[in-house]
């Protein structure tokens, strides 16, 4: 039996690669002749680039850039020939910012623009960027600063490139703007369709989880709106521009990037269609499968790309009651790995073992003679 194992990461617990390896161990315990092909995936959220680089055998490199609070910091990126990938969260991810410092209006993303300039100087032509899991809410002003834009208040004083400055912004200088070469293509791997502004936009949707007080939502949202009406009104209409606290919008406006489906692009890059062409079973998974998963998340994206006739089974941390009845979206069965009632911290810690147990049990089911 040949099985493709294509899970997303389990947030705050296991990477997609670790999830896939645990599931493989489970199947090896219960199916004697099993052949497991590991295809860790991501849909644009945090961990997507790590999932892709395992399949593409990319070389890890580092560059010193401006960090989240103006200090110098080393940032990872992954390269193969003229292709490069990186995640914004490697610089300004929630997990990298201590709780006491989580003010999304003070966190800087200038280093992302600096990294883009470096990659282009190294003759990179294809750049893929994951923007999920960020702690910033700067509307993309940091990206612009890293690409040479300068910002001033009404008295002509230079402003730092952070979200707070949007509240005092009076003018923008493009005198030192870095122009992206026409033969360079920058693509944003997105798993959300949130616009830049409004009640479905970056601030209202993600501000709270990043530490922004709800009393600031309206004024920050309006400041981002005013900024883009000055520099790039068209960006306000882009679906997905709100991803990464507006970083996606900044990349589109200032780096001529395009927003693409995170999961579909991931599957294209790892040549998923070829890998799944002759398999007996596909396993998908993520930490929590719910109705929101139906809108572009990894398990559904993988299931839709699986050939008709190949069964798809989901192995997840938890299954939420709002899911439609099975089968749905080409998924024939779904299993939660939870084995007992216990604190969340323990479930996260034991996830690898629970994944093994669940996969092993599914393997035993597959071994049963047809009834």
From Swiss-Prot:
GO terms for molecular function: ATP binding; glycerate kinase activity. SUPFAM superfamilies: Glycerate kinase I (SSF110738). It catalyses: (R)-glycerate + ATP = (2R)-3-phosphoglycerate + ADP + H(+). Its EC number is 2.7.1.31. Keywords: ATP-binding, Kinase, Nucleotide-binding, Transferase. One of its GO terms (biological process) is organic acid phosphorylation. It holds the Pfam family Gly_kinase. InterPro entries: Glyc_kinase_flavodox-like_fold (IPR018193), Glycerate_kinase (IPR004381), Glycerate_kinase_RE-like (IPR018197), Glycerate_kinase_sf (IPR036129). The keyword Cell membrane does not apply. NCBIfam families: glycerate kinase. Belongs to the glycerate kinase type-1 family. This is Glycerate kinase. The lineage of its organism: Bacteria, Pseudomonadati, Pseudomonadota, Betaproteobacteria, Neisseriales.
């Amino acid at each position: 039996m040949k099985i493709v194992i294509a899970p997303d990461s389990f947030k705050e617990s296991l990477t997609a690669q670790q999830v896939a390896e645990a599931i493989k161990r489970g199947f090896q315990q219960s199916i004697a002749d099993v052949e497991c092909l590991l295809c860790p995936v991501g849909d644009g959220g945090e961990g997507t680039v790590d999932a892709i680089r395992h399949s593409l055998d990319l070389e890890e490199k580092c560059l010193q850039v401006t960090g989240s609070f103006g200090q110098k910091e080393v940032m990872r990126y992954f390269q193969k020939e003229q292709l490069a990938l990186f995640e914004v969260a490697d610089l300004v991810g929630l997990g990298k910012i201590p709780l006491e410092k989580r003010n999304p209006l003070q966190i800087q993303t200038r280093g992302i623009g600096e990294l883009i300039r470096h990659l282009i100087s190294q003759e990179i032509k294809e750049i893929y960027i994951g923007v999920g899991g960020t702690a910033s809410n700067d509307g993309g002003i940091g990206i612009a600063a890293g690409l040479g834009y300068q910002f001033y208040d009404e008295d002509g004083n230079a402003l730092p490139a952070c979200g707070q400055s949007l509240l005092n912004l009076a003018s923008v200088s493009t005198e030192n703007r870095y122009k992206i070469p026409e033969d360079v293509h920058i693509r944003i791997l997105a798993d959300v369709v949130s616009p830049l502004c409004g009640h479905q936009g970056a601030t209202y949707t993600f501000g709270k989880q990043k530490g922004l007080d709800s009393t600031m939502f309206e004024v920050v949202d309006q400041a981002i709106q005013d900024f883009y009406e000055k520099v790039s009104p068209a960006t306000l209409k882009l679906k997905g521009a709100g991803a990464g606290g507006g970083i996606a919008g900044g990349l589109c406006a200032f780096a001529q990037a395009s927003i693409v489906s995170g999961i579909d692009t991931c599957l294209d890059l790892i040549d998923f269609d070829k890998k799944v062409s002759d398999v007996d079973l596909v396993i998908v998974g993520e930490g929590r499968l719910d109705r929101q998963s139906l809108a572009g998340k990894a398990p559904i994206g993988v299931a839709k790309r699986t050939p008709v006739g190949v069964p798809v089974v989901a192995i997840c941390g938890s299954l939420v009651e709002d899911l439609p009845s099975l089968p749905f979206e080409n998924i024939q069965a779904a299993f939660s790995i939870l084995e007992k009632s216990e604190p969340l911290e323990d479930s996260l810690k034991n996830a690898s073992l629970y994944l093994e147990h669940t996969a092993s049990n599914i393997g035993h089911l597959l071994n049963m003679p047809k009834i």
